[in-house]
């Protein structure tokens, strides 16, 4: 059943903008929203059929609040990363002004929903149930990092950064809340702020029109700036996300959230 869920979500992961490159941007955003709803529906149906339960990790009552917190946290985290990079002279920043947000919003939303369902909802949750949280965190973080290994501009540093900063931190948010909503919010806001607000590469990809343009200082070391992969493969991103991840794990431990199941009752 886990394999079936994974394959279904992998199909839903294909960005609508790649399938409809010449479509109206607003239509593309709407199609991305539909893809997210389909992914959520597939996950819910297969969990219901395969595990004989309704997925508490997608409980609707806390969704709005946890999504809002996640969106705010993700935006603040990436803004902090760029403040460090720009302040240290590692990136230049040029404001462009108003730009359509449809493409960036669609990409951020779809990748966040589908990847969180697959990596935290399936891989982390089921490994946690089978082998405990330590193995689940290590394996899911490593797989998340390796999943970005073939992106444009990927390096060993980028794989390590994605595994540690996103794999651990997003998993910790799931562990703390027992839901997927906060990790979805952080994931979406991080990518949107990175690509649309600051105009930087997102995991080596182009998010389309942006409010500004951020360019790395070519003379700086790759591990400081992230190279073509983008700022998330930089040391400042690793430190910021690592700090949030450690604090979140500490809060989860204090809340006694490391039991046999990751999902809250």
Which positions does each model-derived feature cover?
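Aromatic-anchored segments of alpha-helical transmembrane domains
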Residues: 6-11, 78-84, 141-150, 189-197
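Helix-loop interface residues and adjacent transmembrane-helix termini in multi-pass membrane transporters
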Residues: 52, 130-131, 153, 176-177, ...
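Interfacial transmembrane-helix boundary/kink motif in multi-pass membrane proteins
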Residues: 1-4, 24-37, 50-83, 96-104, ...
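N-terminal, membrane-interfacial amphipathic/helix-forming hydrophobic leader that caps
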Residues: 1-55, 195-265
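Residue-level signature of the transmembrane alpha-helical core
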Residues: 33, 71, 75, 105, ...
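Residues that define the loop-to-transmembrane-helix transition and helix capping
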Residues: 134-135, 178-181, 232
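Function-critical hydrophobic alpha-helical transmembrane segments in multi-pass membrane proteins
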Residues: 93-154, 165, 172
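Functionally important transmembrane alpha-helices
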Residues: 159-223
């Amino acid at each position: 059943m886990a394999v079936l869920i994974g394959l279904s979500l992998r199909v839903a992961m294909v960005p609508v903008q790649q399938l409809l490159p010449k479509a109206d941007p607003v239509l593309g955003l709407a199609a991305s929203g539909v893809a997210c709803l389909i992914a959520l529906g597939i996950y819910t149906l297969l969990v219901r059929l395969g595990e004989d339960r309704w997925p508490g990790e997608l409980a609707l009552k806390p969704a709005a609040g946890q999504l809002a917190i996640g969106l705010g946290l993700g935006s603040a985290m990436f803004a902090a990363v760029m403040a460090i990079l720009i302040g240290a002279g590692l990136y230049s920043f040029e404001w462009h002004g108003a730009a359509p947000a449809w493409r960036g919003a669609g990409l951020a939303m779809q990748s966040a929903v589908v990847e969180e369902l697959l990596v935290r909802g399936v891989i982390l949750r089921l490994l946690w149930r089978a082998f405990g949280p330590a193995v689940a965190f290590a394996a899911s973080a490593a797989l998340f990092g390796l999943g970005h290994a073939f992106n444009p501009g990927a390096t060993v540093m980028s794989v390590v950064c994605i595994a540690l900063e996103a794999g651990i931190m997003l998993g910790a948010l799931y562990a703390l809340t027992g839901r997927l909503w906060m990790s979805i919010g952080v994931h979406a806001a991080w990518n949107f702020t990175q690509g649309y607000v600051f105009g930087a590469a997102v995991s080596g990809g182009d998010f389309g029109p942006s409010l500004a343009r951020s360019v790395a200082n070519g003379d700086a070391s790759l591990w400081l700036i992230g190279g073509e992969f983008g700022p998330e493969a930089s040391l400042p991103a690793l430190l910021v996300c690592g700090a949030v991840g450690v604090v979140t794990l500490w809060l989860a431990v204090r809340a006694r959230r490391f039991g046999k199941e990751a999902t809250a009752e």
